[in-house]
Amino acid sequence: MDIASLSAKSCNECSTKLSKFSHAEAAHYLTLLPDWQLADEKLTRAVKVKDFAQALKLANRIGAIAEQENHHPDLLVKWGLLGITIYTHSVNGLTENDFILAAKINNLID
């Protein structure tokens, strides 16, 4: 699998029936996503931007993707920076949905 095929997928409905990834599975998928890190069973990325307005604009664009996929990241909007944290709340860890959303966000940013 590559990032293009990952970003072409759609997120599955979130529920406790989703399979939480093992650390090895998460580490494998992470190799497809440059600029993302694993932290406490969550995907994180910090995106440097020009100013607060650009961070807010990017947050809104990510929000539109999140609504379309019905999978929502935690966003931290700061002057010159947008922090993104993704995980599946229902399993309190990572699932394929998180990596699909991250790939779609990468397409938007990169």
Task: Annotate the PLM regions.
Residues 1-110:
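Long, contiguous binding/interaction regions
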